[in-house]
Amino acid sequence: MNSTNFISGVVKILESPKQKIINTNILVTHFRVQFPQVRNSCIVHLKFWGNLAGDVVTYYKINDYILIEGCIALKDKQTRTSNSKMSKKIEITVLKIYPFLLSHDRSMIAISDW
């Protein structure tokens, strides 16, 4: 059973996006991000669908900060421990994305292209 809610916030990209194609030509991209907090770090999984999935891979890299809007859900995730307990995984299906703070290397390349 999933519980969904709307969420928006700034996150930091932790890993390279992973893409896969499901059904017939539906592109899905997913990767892990972190909310920028001082004391507790909260790592969540983002999922992008369709054209937005392709744009994310093209324009955003590791260590970029992005502003996202989407639906948050708690998914059951079985861990590989000896007692096989079920844990929860936070997953956000992103509907809109905006650049917030891009990494230094890409900013210089973009300026030199002008």
Predicted regions span which residues?
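Single-stranded nucleic acid-binding surfaces, predominantly the OB-fold ssDNA-binding core
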Residues: 1-114
